[in-house]
Amino acid sequence: MIIRSPEPKVQILADPEVKILVDRDPIKTSFEQWAKPGHFSRTIAKGPDTTTWIWNLHADAHDFDSHTSDLEEISRKVFSAHFGQLSIIFLWLSGMYFHGARFSNYEAWLNDPTHIGPSAQVVWPIVGQEILNGDVGGGFRGIQITSGFFQIWRASGITSELQLYCTAIGALVFAGLMLFAGWFHYHKAAPKLAWFQDVESMLNHHLAGLLGLGSLSWARHQVHVSLPINQFLNAGVDPKEIPLPHEFILNRDLLAQLYPSFAEGATPFFTLNWSKYADFLTFRGGLDPLTGGLWLTDIAHHHLAIAILFLIAGHMYRTNWGIGHGIKDILEAHKGPFTGQGHKGLYEILTTSWHAQLSINLAMLGSLTIVVAQHMYSMPPYPYLATDYATQLSLFTHHMWIGGFLIVGAAAHAAIFMVRDYDPTTRYNDLLDRVLRHRDAIISHLNWVCIFLGFHSFGLYIHNDTMSALGRPQDMFSDTAIQLQPVFAQWIQNTHALAPGTTAPGATASTSLTWGGGDLVAVGNKVALLPIPLGTADFLVHHIHAFTIHVTVLILLKGVLFARSSRLIPDKANLGFRFPCDGPGRGGTCQVSAWDHVFLGLFWMYNSISVVIFHFSWKMQSDVWGTINDQGVVTHITAGNFAQSSITINGWLRDFLWAQASQVIQSYGSSLSAYGLFFLGAHFVWAFSLMFLFSGRGYWQELIESIVWAHNKLKVAPATQPRALSIVQGRAVGVTHYLLGGIATTWAFFLARIIAVG
């Protein structure tokens, strides 16, 4: 049985020279229309009969596919919404900078970042809550922040609160501009579909403009503003005495005093004598021992190099001049011995299905965000970031969660593409078709891998718990008994530690101190970073990571590959992206929609990321973070207990969760007490989710009808008829509170602990 999706409006361009790319005044600006709730849907616009109406209103407001099937109109709405999103981002950034200007101890921190903690929030003395204003040093009382903004401001060369005010106002102006642009490009000059589908032009502009010129302008700012200002700060000059940014930009002699090559201007550039610039464009590797961050001259060099690459990349694609790559040609030439037609037809998919496009972008951005999390601690980019343990832990945790959500989003939109945009009648023997035809083999093999990893990884722990319980430490898997050393990881560490002098002859240290070989870097008697030893304990928990990630992928991929049909429900595509069951009279067909796979995938994503951040938090406290005395002896926060304690489940519960929860549990009466309240409240939110996840719709409908009866008795019954949440709505509310409660609990646990001991 072939299920046809509605035909999308395809308009692939033959002639690249398109003249008029916008429609003028396509849709009038109508406040009357906006004031009508649900104006985008005939059904919802009629107003509420039952309380389900408010749920449908929220579910469909941004589901532009449900408003119209016209791809051009959908594209315009998405484009306009992007400007709204940018406006919110600028507004948020403005708020951050304003807090730094108005409520923070930034200038004091700048003078003494090793003894003063960053704070940008002071609680008003209402009901005694001023207890939350802890002493962060230098006589300032406020809430310690862990966002890393102070470090990034210092790296940018911001030396006063006035500069923060100006930036905050600038961001507000940009927020207004973005709002205007969102309105203008939907109501006044809306791009045609052809403009959205002109991928070569888009690639050229994004690569050369956003990434190329963006990196180049940041490199320019670093060289002309950040480097000299940080040079002065590092030398102990009072921030008020340092020349202002524009003085460095306008007066070359000022820069030449710090970096002699500036005296020669652009001559070395045009005479190809580039090594002259090595005083401010370096290739050192390792960390600046003064600040514990990457060398800012290395970072400037990096952005200059990246800019060149992206500027070249932005000239590679064929637009009006008949030279360069065409994406369609590249994709259609992409065939292998086992891939049939290869990527034939993929160009049409990616230019007519924004869900398919978004799915790929989310998968890549999610992976990249997780890569950022790994690099923020192993290559700390900003001055004094590495010794601010609370910020390090927060940045790692934040980027891991964000990456996890983005990757689940990738699966969600891939499934929506399969249901709404995929047309099986036009796709034959291309890569996607071939994947779909052997999906049973893929999923069953992946399932086998999950079972194997699950039993073996947990089996190793259970073995250790059993041996430990029976008093047989000599029979445990550990660094002191039966060793399971991560030899491949150790080999990679060693290879990178040896790289300076061989693969990178100019570098004096490896890319990251964590590889080994180097000495530790300490700032103000606190460890910034040192070689991280890997042993049996890491080998065990890494296999738990492998297990949880593979199960997440199994659930999400099954949802995508079986989104349109399965043996159980051959006509699944007709039921849509989310549905509770395959109608009455077909038992055992509930919770099979693509949406339900996303729902289940979220729980396993939560499992995966939780284990990762727990591993990171304990490993760093045990083997990296700590203090160093004058004799060079390092005392770690948990005294290196990870290797011996984390090899049993009991050890994780006793020496990590319970032992490190003491700070949050005992926080009442101290400046950390808000975390104690959050810890309690977030546990409650998490438990509240179970009420939605464990009970059925009928239970609530019965309860509601009793309550409505009571209201009728008292003649206070509402006109809108109350309804229980649908099955899908209940699960959505459940998973939202589960994740919100779980993440906020972890946040309170981590921060109370690390602010107290870090």
From Swiss-Prot:
What positions does the entry give for chlorophyll a binding? M691, Y699
As one GO molecular function, the record gives: chlorophyll binding
Kindly list the positions annotated as binding chlorophyll a'. Answer: H683
Binding residue positions for [4Fe-4S] cluster: C581, C590
Reactions performed catalytically: reduced [plastocyanin] + hnu + oxidized [2Fe-2S]-[ferredoxin] = oxidized [plastocyanin] + reduced [2Fe-2S]-[ferredoxin]
Membrane topology reported for the UniProt record: Multi-pass membrane protein
Single biological process term from Gene Ontology: photosynthesis
Q: Which GO terms describe its cellular component?
A: chloroplast thylakoid membrane; photosystem I
Q: Does the keyword Transmembrane apply?
A: yes
This chain's protein is named: Photosystem I P700 chlorophyll a apoprotein A1
Q: What is the species listed in this Swiss-Prot or TrEMBL entry?
A: Pisum sativum
Upper lineage is:
Eukaryota, Viridiplantae, Streptophyta, Embryophyta, Tracheophyta
Q: Gene encoding this polypeptide? A: psaA
